[in-house]
Each structure stands twice: as C-alpha cells, then as structure tokens.
UniProtKB/Swiss-Prot annotation:
Membrane-topology annotation of the record: Multi-pass membrane protein
Family, per entry: Belongs to the Lgt family.
Gene that this polypeptide is encoded by: lgt
Database matches in HAMAP family: Lgt (MF_01147)
Organism of this sequence: Cupriavidus necator (strain ATCC 17699 / DSM 428 / KCTC 22496 / NCIMB 10442 / H16 / Stanier 337)
Superkingdom assignment: Bacteria
Name of the protein described by the UniProt record: Phosphatidylglycerol--prolipoprotein diacylglyceryl transferase
Cited function: Catalyzes the transfer of the diacylglyceryl group from phosphatidylglycerol to the sulfhydryl group of the N-terminal cysteine of a prolipoprotein, the first step in the formation of mature lipoproteins.
Pathway where it operates: Protein modification; lipoprotein biosynthesis (diacylglyceryl transfer)
PANTHER family reported for this sequence: PHOSPHATIDYLGLYCEROL--PROLIPOPROTEIN DIACYLGLYCERYL TRANSFERASE, PROLIPOPROTEIN DIACYLGLYCERYL TRANSFERASE
Amino acid sequence: MLIHPQFDPVAIHLGPLAIRWYGLMYLAGFIMFLGFGRLRIRQPHIAAKGWTTRDLDDMLFFGVLGVILGGRLGYVLFYKPSYYLAHPLEILKVWEGGMAFHGGFLGVVVAMWLFGKLRRRHWMEVTDFIAPMIPCGLAAGRIGNFINGELWGRATDLPWGMIFPQAGDNIPRHPSQLYQFAGEGVALFIVLWLFARKPRPMGAVSGVFLIGYGAFRFAAEFAREPDNFLGLLALKLSMGQWLSLPMILAGIAMVVWAYRRQPGAGASQPVA
C-alpha cells in the first residue's frame, strides 16, 4: 500500500506570486508541443506541404484559446449545467477549477477550423498536423492531476493501491491519473508519432487520434472514481466513457472515409 505524498500545489513562491505545479504542467505541454512540432515540420512529407514554425506558433495560440474556452464550457454543459444555470457568473471563475477534456477537444477543433480558414487549409489537414503532439499536453496534465492529488481512482486491493488523503476515507485507490498518463499520454504519443511518420490520407491521423484517445480514456475510466455529483450513468458507465464513445465512432468513420477517398497516402489540398 502506498500513500500519496501530498505535494505542495504551489511549486514556486516568489513573494506574493505563487506558481502552481498545474500551471507548470501546462507550460511543459506547450513546450513539448512546440519542440515536437518543429521536428514534425522537418519530416519530408510535412515540409512538402509548406508548414512553417510561424504556423506552429499561431496554432498553439489558437489551440490554447480553444482549450480554455471549450474546456470550461464543456465542464459547464456536460457536468454541472443546472448549477451554472443558477449561478451563471460562476462560469467566469476558471481559476477555481472545472475543465473538461471533451469540451476542450471541441474547442480545439473549432480553433483549428478558424486557423485553417485564415491559412486557406482544410481543417483536417490542420488537425492531422497537430494530432501527434496533443498527447504531450495530455501527459503533462495527468501528472498535474497526480501532483494535486485529484481525480483519484476507485478502491483497490492491488499492491500499488494508493491512499489519497484528500479523498478523506483512508482507502487504497487506483492511481488512475498515472494510468491515463501512460495511456492517453505516452502510449498514444508513440502510436501517433509512428503512424504519422509516413504520408497518410487527409483525416487518417486525426481519426487514429480519436480512436486512440477514446479507447484509452474509456478503459481508464473503469479504474477512475466517478464524479461524486454524477456517479455512474446508464449501463453503469461514467460521463467520461459516454463522451468517449462518440469519439471512437467518429475516429473509425474518419479513417474509413480517409482511405476510401484517397487510397494509399495522399496529400491534402488547400481549401479555396
């Protein structure tokens, strides 16, 4: 049995300024996105499409806005709609927490669609480019969850079961944040990076991301404690699982569409 070390959520104290671990994890995710993005630009089939480091920087800016706005609205709509309907001003208090990946994902899709319009590129060409780097941010975020001792797992008697003091029940639980770090972070990054090293039909890389994330998240939710204000829903599945199922189905549809539309590897064309 292990005990969560209860890290100080503030990593650096600079007088009145407090820099939190979770903020540093966001920063680490952005740095990895830019670093691996620059490596991706050098791949011959990517360089042939004219991607530049300026595009990468601009995509990060658009993506951050999409994550924040979409993540917050997703949490409001998917998890606590009645509460925020009664307290609408609370929606603005993002510093108090409350973000949803699935909402952030939709926000990024909209942001990349807008970016594509500005650059005269199809939105799926944009998402195909960024998909292999997204797991870097997911991995960093899950480490942030673990450091904060939040989003712990269900009770377990496995040797690596961990007591999370913030749970308040002294029960060993799955360190589900680390499961998600390993699955939707490390493993998904490896799969996508290897898959995207070769030219693929437009939409294929994005589709594989949807399938991979949805599958890893769906599986990890069996070890993760459901949100106490929601519990388990129909078929004893969590909200995270129900939101992941459409991602898996959409990913399968995108991959099938991509290969039927462009057999073999094909380069996408800019939109007019």
